[in-house]
Amino acid sequence: RSIADDIRQHFGLCFIHVFSKSQAQNNSENIYVKGREHMKYADRYGNRWEETGLQDRFLEKLYKSVPGRAVVKVLVHPWVSRMGGWILSQKASCWLIPLFLKGHPMDESGWVKRRFTSYNDFFMRKLKPGQRPVEEDTARIISPCDAKLTVCPITEYGIMKIKHTPYTVRELLKSEKLARAYEGGYGFVYRLTVDDYHRYIYTETGKKSGNYKIPGIFHTVNPIANDLEPIYKENTREFCLIRTTDAGTVLQMEVGALMVGKIENDQEEAFVHRGEEKGRFAFGGSTIVVLYQRGQVQPDQDLLDNSRDGYETKVIQGEAVGDKVEKCRK
């Protein structure tokens, strides 16, 4: 049985299933063994495991062949993702919902029950109150979303290595002055997959800046693409600054990806609260990057160990992921 046969079978469920798993591997560590990719995961209980995805083999062929890269040049244009987002926002797209659930079984008991008006409406569904409690100890920093987390130390030269690919914070933010503020700090890279909850919250209480939008294209943020393209300095992204009293100035960024129709943030300048909903992603896997300045936070050791060894750690929205150094001193 050929890879082509596997791909044809997988496309039988519909095109969203291909992007579902391909986006489901954003930013994670990979090892190539006889043409297969092993995605490395960990949980907060000390368990580690590896998975191999068919879609990663598909993307490997797409990104690593001449014909495939010609296709990629078309797919990454913003109009393709806008078109896909428009299609998935139409009422007619509702028929895709049961197909998605067939391929991605979920516990629906925690959802707010209502009739979905489109596939994107389903994708951005709300959870019932209490389903994602926020860590009560304000001396702890929290995850903004359900995700697979990698913690990246930022060097004194502003370099942050995401998987095997080094990025400068200046490239990420398109601002040398702002980038200097995060040298020696930490970057928390949260990879959302299609089966994650795609609403996200503010990580801290403080005065929020306006939203800074950096236009770009829409590569998948799968690690195969990350090996070949500097996706985090090319993809469309949006960020804000949160000036806090106990964690410095925190930068929270949303990164778009292939087939993400749009990033929806609710507020411009405002005073915001930790745990308050910030926004949501339309269809597709995507990424949230949170940057902390030098000496402000200390990530939990298990997250540092897992990230060092190439494992992404599964976390949920509101979960504690580290300590605020200022609170620890008190």
Feature annotation, model-predicted:
Residues 19, 32-34:
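N-terminal non-cleavable signal-anchor helices
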Residues 18-22, 100:
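Low-complexity, charge- and small-residue-enriched intrinsically disordered regions
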Residues 35-330:
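Contiguous, well-folded functional domains in the mature portion of proteins
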